[in-house]
């Protein structure tokens, strides 16, 4: 049974006993938001990330989800992407396609991925243009209080350094406000060339999920969620800057990742 509570500023926190429990809860949540979004406006615009997140979504291709999810209404995007060929092992697109999208009935034309034949800067520009066209056609909702799209659900992993998408600590990309998509040629993790959603886009979503597992994430989770004295290095921690302006934020983690949280230590 997950230990769950709501922080006044940092959203809902769900600390799970193990990865199996986390995966079941995450997939239940995705299916629930999918159904609600389709009921509300006829589509579900979901944003994926790379890493272990896709493996935690694996139960979506199993009963009952494979039959009850309305895959034809899904529109799929990526919060960040490595600027490599789509068949390259580093590609977030390939990871999602091989392990999820090729096994369900999402229409190929509903999958919005980057152009992998151009530079990182061009890929970011083209990706933003494609999303702007989808906002203009009302496939993707527009935010009521910012010049940003309002995705139904953005799924983020988190690194041990507190990075989300390809927004790394102390990187200039954190300061980009006017673009929806920006690019990096000096990523702190290889490969160096990437595109990423900017913080205004992430924080304009209706629902944002951050998934973190393992002891190596515990300190970053503590800095991202707990109340800390100021000034503090956590202020430049990308995960702490995830703060939907008019949406929901939920943290899914296992006990190891949550082990340094003040509330979790007290409950133990």
Curated annotation (Swiss-Prot):
One of its GO terms (molecular function) is 6-phosphogluconolactonase activity. One of its GO terms (biological process) is carbohydrate metabolic process. One of its GO terms (cellular component) is cytosol. It is found in: Cytoplasm, Cytosol. Disruption phenotype: No visible phenotype under normal growth conditions. It comes from the Eukaryota. Pathway: Carbohydrate degradation; pentose phosphate pathway; D-ribulose 5-phosphate from D-glucose 6-phosphate (oxidative stage): step 2/3. It catalyses: 6-phospho-D-glucono-1,5-lactone + H2O = 6-phospho-D-gluconate + H(+). InterPro entries: 6-phosphogluconolactonase_DevB, Glc/Gal-6P_isomerase, NagB/RpiA_transferase-like, PGLS. The keyword Hydrolase applies. Pfam families: Glucosamine_iso. Its EC number is 3.1.1.31. Keywords: Cytoplasm, Hydrolase. Catalyzes the hydrolysis of 6-phosphogluconolactone to 6-phosphogluconate. Belongs to the glucosamine/galactosamine-6-phosphate isomerase family. 6-phosphogluconolactonase subfamily. This is Probable 6-phosphogluconolactonase 1. It comes from Arabidopsis thaliana. The gene is PGL1.
């Amino acid at each position: 049974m997950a230990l769950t509570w709501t922080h006044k500023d940092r959203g809902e926190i769900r600390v799970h006993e193990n990865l199996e429990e986390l995966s079941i809860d995450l997939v239940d949540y995705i299916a629930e938001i999918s159904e609600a979004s389709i009921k509300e406006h006829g589509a579900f615009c979901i944003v994926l990330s790379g890493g272990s997140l896709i493996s935690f979504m694996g139960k979506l291709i199993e009963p009952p989800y494979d039959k009850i999810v309305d895959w034809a209404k899904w529109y799929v995007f990526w919060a960040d992407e490595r600027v490599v060929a789509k068949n390259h092992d580093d590609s977030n697109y390939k990871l999602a396609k091989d392990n999820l999208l090729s096994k369900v009935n999402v229409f190929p034309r509903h999958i919005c991925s980057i152009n992998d034949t151009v530079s990182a800067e061009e890929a970011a520009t083209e990706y933003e243009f494609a999303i702007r066209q989808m906002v203009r056609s009302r496939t993707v909702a527009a935010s009521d209080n910012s010049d940003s799209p309002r995705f139904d659900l953005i799924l983020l992993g988190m690194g041990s350094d507190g990075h989300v998408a390809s927004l790394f600590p102390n990187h200039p990309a954190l300061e980009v406000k006017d673009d929806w998509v920006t690019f990096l040629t000096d990523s702190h993790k290889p490969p160096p060339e990437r595109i990423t959603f900017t913080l205004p886009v992430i924080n304009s979503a209706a629902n944002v999920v951050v998934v973190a597992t393992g002891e190596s994430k515990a300190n970053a989770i503590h800095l991202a969620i707990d109340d800390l004295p100021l000034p503090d290095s956590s202020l430049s921690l990308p995960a702490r800057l995830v703060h939907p302006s008019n949406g929901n934020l939920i943290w899914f983690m296992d006990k190891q990742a949550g082990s340094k949280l003040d509330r979790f230590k007290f409950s133990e």
